[in-house]
UniProtKB/Swiss-Prot annotation:
Top-level taxon of the source organism: Viruses
Sequence ranges of Polar residues compositional bias: 10-29
Native organism: Influenza B virus (strain B/Panama/45/1990)
Residues covered by region (Disordered): 1-73
Gene Ontology biological-process entries: symbiont entry into host cell; viral penetration into host nucleus
GO cellular component, one term: host cell
Protein's name in the database: Nucleoprotein
RNA-binding as UniProt keyword: yes
Taxonomic lineage of the native organism: Viruses, Riboviria, Orthornavirae, Negarnaviricota, Polyploviricotina
InterPro entries: Flu_NP
GO molecular function annotations of the record: RNA binding; structural molecule activity
């Protein structure tokens, strides 16, 4: 203990009892100084489910452990309650914005505006950072910005004879008002609702944009795109966000951390930074589905001074995840404008599953409308919307085509841009279209990588990350994977690397034929109880990979 003086008490030598110390003559309560060994142990592995980024208290931890585990029915009821409340919040925000027409409320861009405003209003840490930064800027003579407000671009409907157009309007809200309205509607802090929205935005980004720059920056090949799910998820999405992230996303986070540690050798001496780094690696280890992959992560965890060798190990791990896929959770996330329609759609079951029939039935009932940007094709835009809702950016296009009865195209063949309209494109009288692609069949969603089997693939994107649990061959470009396998495995952990490469080679050799998700079938959308399973037809004329040869704009080039 250091010899610093606390309230007149020298902490170097204490010759009084704690009671004598605390009974001061001034009547004020003084601290009890306890030996360091009596301090409660810190729980390094405490997860933070809160999007406010606050640390979880040990009392809350104990409370969670003693809670009775929810039954599947109870979970479905609480999820139903959450999505209905999100819809109520959307309706309140639209009333406040003065947008009351059904067409305005069905507009995906208006839903996204409300969602972004809510996320900005509830991000206290970012608001505090902006305030401090702005205070410094004002001292340097820059303009003062009111960070107590947040806003977004909404679209108001304009009727011209028989034609309907939309015109952009900028509306601002007080952050505190938005927060209060949200918490009152949800009946709690509503962290699960915020996480749900963040996942929806992440899935939309995965579909609309490529992440070549982000992959190249950490030395990963752009062909590993199928492992990069959830790469735009904010850290405050907590454990829910980690479940959605692909293995490559976590590898990239770890490599970035190692890069910072190499530039600043004191970084990992900071307990907060070290804990954050260890947490990323533990999450990565939990993602891995093969013991050889877990052994490689253990090798990196055991490294005292992370450096180039660890980056090489993690790069190999990311490559192996193309062949032996990690567990990535899949969820159906719809714009909150659709949840607002639940009472009107006759959706009378008070249970809702984000991975099962209810979410898919709700998607089919909805009538979402999107602004069309210059050169957008309405059918192609519908495909983007479908894939965004189902998080199907890296799913096999043949599976999606079988479920919808529509031939899905790769990203490079789609004549449409993302759903966010940049400021320079916002003009008076913008057209819109109904998102028309619907499910003819449904199948439960999966969190498994479908590792039973592999198959042949193409170029560009070289593997799939399954979303729907239906029996099919897993598309994989063996030629591209074999190119990646020709690497140097010498060094401190040659055995671990060698084992992993052997596993990949064995996997490639034996998995030429056969299917993954054996016995899993699809069902007609009217068949809620799975009474008549249907074999999935795989059309060989449709390409496997959405990002085969991609021409999408990069997420990093976005002009928000």
């Amino acid at each position: 203990m250091s010899n610093m003086d606390i309230d007149g008490i020298n902490t170097g030598t204490i010759d009084k009892t704690p009671e004598e110390i605390t009974s001061g003559t001034s009547g004020t309560t003084r601290p009890i100084i306890r030996p360091a060994t009596l301090a409660p142990p810190s729980n390094k592995r405490t997860r933070n489910p809160s999007p406010e980024r606050a640390t979880t208290s040990s009392e809350a931890d104990v409370g969670r452990k003693t809670q009775k585990k929810q039954t599947p029915t109870e979970i479905k009821k609480s999820v139903y309650n959450m999505v209905v409340k999100l819809g109520e919040f959307y309706n309140q925000m639209m009333v406040k914005a003065g947008l009351n027409d059904d067409m305005e409320r069905n507009l995906i861009q208006n839903a996204h505006a409300v969602e972004r405003i809510l996320l900005a209003a509830t991000d206290d840490k970012k608001t505090e950072f902006q305030r401090k930064k702005n205070a410094r800027d004002v001292k340097e003579g820059k303009e003062e910005i009111d960070h107590n407000k947040t806003g977004g671009t909404f679209y108001k409907m304009v009727r011209d004879d028989k034609t309907i157009y939309f015109s952009p309007i900028r509306i601002t809200f007080l952050k505190e008002e938005v927060k209060t309205m949200y918490k009152t509607t949800m009946g709690s802090d509503g962290f699960s609702g915020l996480n749900h929205i963040m996942i929806g935005h992440s899935q939309m980004n995965d579909v609309c944009f490529q992440r070549s720059k982000a992959l190249k920056r950490v030395g990963l090949d752009p062909s590993l795109i199928s492992t990069f799910a959830g790469s735009t998820l904010p850290r405050r999405s907590g454990a829910t966000g980690v479940a959605i992230k692909g293995g490559g996303t976590l590898v990239a986070e770890a490599i970035r951390f190692i890069g910072r540690a190499m530039a600043d050798r004191g970084l990992l001496r900071d307990i907060k930074a070290k804990t954050a780094y260890e947490k990323i690696l533990l999450n990565l280890k939990n993602k891995c589905s093969a013991p050889q992959q877990k052994a490689l992560v253990d090798q990196v965890i055991g490294s005292r001074n992370p450096g180039i060798a660890d980056i090489e190990d993690l790069t190999l791990l990311a490559r192996s995840m193309v062949v032996v896929r990690p567990s990535v959770a899949s969820k159906v996330v719809l714009p909150i404008s659709i949840y607002a329609k639940i009472p009107q759609l006759g959706f009378n079951v008070e249970e809702y599953s984000m991975v099962g029939y209810e979410a898919m039935a709700l998607y089919n009932m909805a009538t979402p409308v999107s602004i069309l940007r210059m050169g957008d094709d309405a059918k192609d835009k519908s495909q983007l919307f479908f894939m965004s809702c189902f998080g199907a950016a890296y799913e096999d296009l043949r599976v999606l085509s079988a479920l919808t009865g529509i031939e899905f195209k790769p990203r490079s063949a789609l004549k449409c841009k993302g759903f966010h309209v940049p400021a320079k494109e916002q003009v008076e009288g913008m057209g819109a279209a109904l998102m028309s692609i619907k499910l003819q069949f449904w199948a439960p969603m999966t969190r498994s990588g479908g590792n039973e089997v592999g198959g042949d693939g193409g170029s560009g994107q070289i593997s799939c990350s399954p979303v729907f649990a239906v029996e099919r061959p897993i598309a994989l470009s063996k030629q591209a994977v074999r190119r990646m396998l020709s690497m140097n495995i010498e060094g401190r952990d040659a055995d671990v690397k060698g084992n992993l490469l052997k596993m990949m080679n064995d996997s490639m050799a034996k998995k030429t034929n056969g299917n993954a998700f054996i016995g899993k079938k699809m069902f007609q959308i009217s068949d809620k109880n799975k009474t008549n399973p249907v074999e999935i037809p795989i059309k060989q004329t449709i390409p496997n990979f959405f990002f085969g040869r991609d021409t999408a704009e990069d997420y990093d080039d976005l002009d928000y």
